[in-house]
Amino acid sequence: MREIVHIQAGQCGNQIGAKFWEVISDEHGIDPTGTYHGDSDLQLDRISVYYNEATGGKYVPRAILVDLEPGTMDSVRSGPFGQIFRPDNFVFGQSGAGNNWAKGHYTEGAELVDSVLDVVRKEAESCDCLQGFQLTHSLGGGTGSGMGTLLISKIREEYPDRIMNTFSVVPSPKVSDTVVEPYNATLSVHQLVENTDETYCIDNEALYDICFRTLKLTTPTYGDLNHLVSATMSGVTTCLRFPGQLNADLRKLAVNMVPFPRLHFFMPGFAPLTSRGSQQYRALTVPELTQQVFDAKNMMAACDPRHGRYLTVAAVFRGRMSMKEVDEQMLNVQNKNSSYFVEWIPNNVKTAVCDIPPRGLKMAVTFIGNSTAIQELFKRISEQFTAMFRRKAFLHWYTGEGMDEMEFTEAESNMNDLVSEYQQYQDATAEEEEDFGEEAEEEA
């Protein structure tokens, strides 16, 4: 079976990672002790992708928990599913990274990274045929961003032919912990562009807006934001965990979704949006779900898809529904909004259906879009970065850990290049080649 090794780094990474394991354990009928109590063969069919079967029929997550301070991991350990993880897979330091990317990437994190890689190796060796890695982390702090990207490049060195997938939480002033988030995020994106195959951009700005506007929560907590994240992560991994044809492994997903290697930043979406602990009073129809999931308000990245064009899209419908209706509705969306899909990639929208819906819903749909509008997110961070970097504000915290200003300049220009690449493909048309030909003839 094709296994995935999951790594969660830093406070945010460990919190959303822990929620992810709660949600998928529930979907696969696995209780907090790792015992199976399910009711469907589908739950066990591909259980080995994320779980190792230990002695006595216990299922243990292929998860590695990493942090530079013990706090968050202690709370994961004492949380609802804390006992399901392998005790040896908790790797933590004592110093903390103090929201400083340089500490996570070059100093504190670099000291801990080898002990993490030992655990990674151990997990990889127990796999029959490892397909790749997934990392949950944030880009705004010190450990998840700095040490997370360090882990990615080290794993990349050791397993160059395995897929590297990240769930990266992008910082926003609306839910901000630190003033240096734009620095940490820019330095991280600089790494992600080069070293990952697929990155789901989970944007705190969008999560906050969904909680505030759609779910009418006046003061959203991290718990509320993480509820949305776990629903989304459960949705985008459905194809990997349950039997099906489309995007059934990380590599197939990458082949379908990434037309150019640097443009691998996906915009996730989810419908129906519900708040924690609420029940759904009416089942939505397939047309309603389809219409909702393409709506900017349902995107987990604060970008308006109507400001760009989709290069590729994958949608995962969950629950009992007619395949025919799903296909009709998806075609309908494409026909009505054809200008928002690039015409030079035909059939760039793919759909999968899984019979098992998420807990508490009859039907749900998860959306993965590779849209050029994601440049809005990078522009937002870039503007905040430039405002501080122009005055060299807070730089001494980074140079004090041995970093050079040059590295900031490089990261900044790499992110600006990424924005221009998205813009270039947004403006590209199928007919362009011929135009160039004609112009050349006229000049001649």
UniProtKB/Swiss-Prot annotation:
Cofactors demanded by this protein: Mg(2+)
Biased composition (Acidic residues): 429-444
Sites of Omega-N-methylarginine modification: R318
UniProt region (Disordered), positions on chain: 423-444
Tissues in which the protein is found: Ubiquitously expressed with highest levels in spleen, thymus and immature brain.
SMART domains assigned: Tubulin, Tubulin_C
Motif MREI motif mapped to chain: 1-4
Cited InterPro entries: Beta-tubulin_BS, Beta_tubulin, Tub_FtsZ_C, Tubulin, Tubulin/FtsZ-like_C, Tubulin/FtsZ_2-layer-sand-dom, Tubulin/FtsZ_GTPase_sf, Tubulin_C
GO molecular function, one term: protein-containing complex binding
Residues the record lists as 5-glutamyl polyglutamate modifications: E434, E438, E439, E441
Gene Ontology cellular component list: azurophil granule lumen; cell body; cytoplasm; cytoplasmic ribonucleoprotein granule; cytoskeleton; cytosol; extracellular exosome; extracellular region
One GO BP: cytoskeleton-dependent intracellular transport
PTM-bearing positions, type N6-acetyllysine: K58
UniProt modified residues of type N6-succinyllysine: K58
Record-listed 5-glutamyl glycine modification sites: E438, E439, E441, E442, E443
Residues with PTM Phosphothreonine: T55, T285, T290
Induction entry: Autoregulated by feedback control of mRNA degradation. In excess of soluble tubulin, nascent beta-tubulin chain binds TTC5/STRAP cofactor through the MREI motif which triggers cotranslation degradation of tubulin mRNA.
Family classification: Belongs to the tubulin family.
Role this protein plays: Tubulin is the major constituent of microtubules, a cylinder consisting of laterally associated linear protofilaments composed of alpha- and beta-tubulin heterodimers. Microtubules grow by the addition of GTP-tubulin dimers to the microtubule end, where a stabilizing cap forms. Below the cap, tubulin dimers are in GDP-bound state, owing to GTPase activity of alpha-tubulin.
Domain notes: The highly acidic C-terminal region may bind cations such as calcium.
Protein name, per record: Tubulin beta chain
